[in-house]
Curated annotation (Swiss-Prot):
Similarity comment text for this entry: Belongs to the PIP family.
Gene Ontology cellular-component annotations: extracellular space
Key words of the record: Disulfide bond, Glycoprotein, Pyrrolidone carboxylic acid, Secreted, Signal
Name of the protein this chain belongs to: Prolactin-inducible protein homolog
Glycosylation sites: 105
Length: 146
């Protein structure tokens, strides 16, 4: 009987502690920063052999800078500036925008890829981080030729 009374006496304090811990854990989970935020823009449709400009805007919510390499991949081989790869230092206060100009005469799926890489001489003082969870981010669009 005495043990049961102790159990009920500790219960409100335990419940309050659990509630505080739960509220603290939820607040910490909501405060996660996005590693890469990307906006890939290409026209939805073009005429055959018309010049296409693809634009990829990249930013981060991390406080630290990262070295990123951006490039495009397509479902069919494309010529020209499509094959350019860009390497840049991406920081919270310095978003980047990349451009590719190319031609196509058939419908194609295009993926814009952002790799977080380890490379010296890109960020000031070589101060950059690499995320542990993932280091490749991509988005795809379809370009129709009509």
């Amino acid at each position: 009987m005495r043990l049961l009374q102790l159990l009920f006496r500790a219960s409100p304090a335990t419940l309050l502690l659990v509630l505080c811990l739960q509220l603290g854990a939820n607040k910490a989970q909501d405060n996660t920063r996005k590693i890469i935020i990307k906006d890939f823009d290409i026209p939805k449709s073009v005429r055959p052999n018309e010049e296409v400009t693809a634009t990829l805007a990249v930013r981060t919510e991390l406080k630290e800078c990262m070295v990123v390499k951006t490039y495009l991949i397509s479902s069919v081989p494309l010529e020209g500036g499509f094959n350019y790869k860009y390497t840049a230092c991406l920081c919270n206060n310095n978003p980047k925008t990349f451009y590719w100009d190319f031609y196509t005469n058939r419908t194609v799926q295009i993926a814009a890829v952002v790799d977080v890489i380890r490379e010296l001489g890109i960020c000031p003082d070589d101060a950059a981080v690499i995320p542990i969870k993932s280091n490749r981010f991509y988005t795809t669009e379809t370009l129709k030729v009509e």
